[in-house]
Amino acid sequence: RWLYEHMRQICIEMGLYVAQIHKECTEQTCPSMQANGQPFYCAAHGRPRTCSAVGYAVHTLDYTMRHLSSALPDGGTGDAAQKHFQSMMRRLYRIFAHAYFHHREFFERQEAASGLFARFVRLGRKHALLPESQLIIPDLPTTA
């Protein structure tokens, strides 16, 4: 239950994050979701396909909040729920990765103000929700 509540809080704060990045990350400036040259496909369309970065962010937050608001397998505590949390964290991480690699000033400004990314990474590492092999943003002093 504790992990579930932290995930919900992160999503709430990420909603504000996405609303703010939308000023510089638009469908015109970032027509596809990518980070560090790696494209990411949006699963919100039935079959995964390319989507603008801001569209991907909105779709991912919507997907995650919907799943957190519905009944998670095992009441949010078993292996099935762990797989859902891992999938959610992997997709949410991509939003931060896009901001870091394509909107660095925004990323740094937001991180200095809220520490949201650091909290996100610490939560993911503590509960084995983010495989180290998929973390493409270099460790920051607040995430190491």
What do the PLM-derived regions correspond to, one by one?
Residues 1-77, 127, 131-138:
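Extended alpha-helical interaction segments
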Residues 78-120:
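Conserved, folded interaction/cargo-binding domains in eukaryotic regulatory proteins
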Residues 110-144:
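Eukaryote-biased recognition of C-terminal alpha-helical segments
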